[in-house]
Amino acid sequence: VILDLEDSVGAADKAAARDHIAAFLDEVTDAQVLLRINAADTIHYHLDLALAQHPNLAGVILPKAEAQSTNATADILSCPLWPLIESVRGLSELPATVRVPGVARLLYGTLDLALELGLDSNQEGGLSMLNQGRFLLLTESLMAGLPAPIDGVCPAVHDDDQLRRTAQYSYAAGMGGMMCIHPKQVALVESIFTPSEAQIEWARAVEKAAVTQHSSFQFRGQMVDEPVLKLARKIVARSK
């Protein structure tokens, strides 16, 4: 769950939002809660950082993340940092950003990046450009030993068909999950990014069969080598 202090909260309401979030965090001890603070170049950043020290937070999301702001924020925090990459500079500085100690996972801010570049993500050309960003996030995450990045939101809150297509596309593109802009989107997105029972059964069976093998082997008519075994392990990990 992401508690947001940035775009969803107007400037006049940010102080009250911090108070409400602090009160909520005081009441929870085992919730997996991330806090999205305001960007480092805003007047709200340092006030948000004080709240970001709360011990019941699982992590902090830094919007408009670049290498310098990621490094400065990670130095202050005691919890994992999730940089939200949503600018051209953020993309260009990914090799440095992913290697900042404390960075847990990348998120992809497709809406803001599309706005900066003047892209229409509903058209093939705009989608193709955003895919180049996905490729960069995926490869840099892999090189740094981070989990697959989390994709941007689908703004169509009341269009389940569009949400399904967007989530399926994101899953096929190798992304590790997808942010939701509204709670009603969670169940559908989760169902797409969660392996099916058949996939889980296959993956566990492959892992079990591999225990007694020392090289490539055949399993249910399929050749299993190291890449296939890695896929099976990834499916099992996702199922958890």
Language-model region placement:
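Expand to "…catalyze enediolate/carbanion chemistry for C-C bond making/breaking, isomerization
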Residues: 1-240
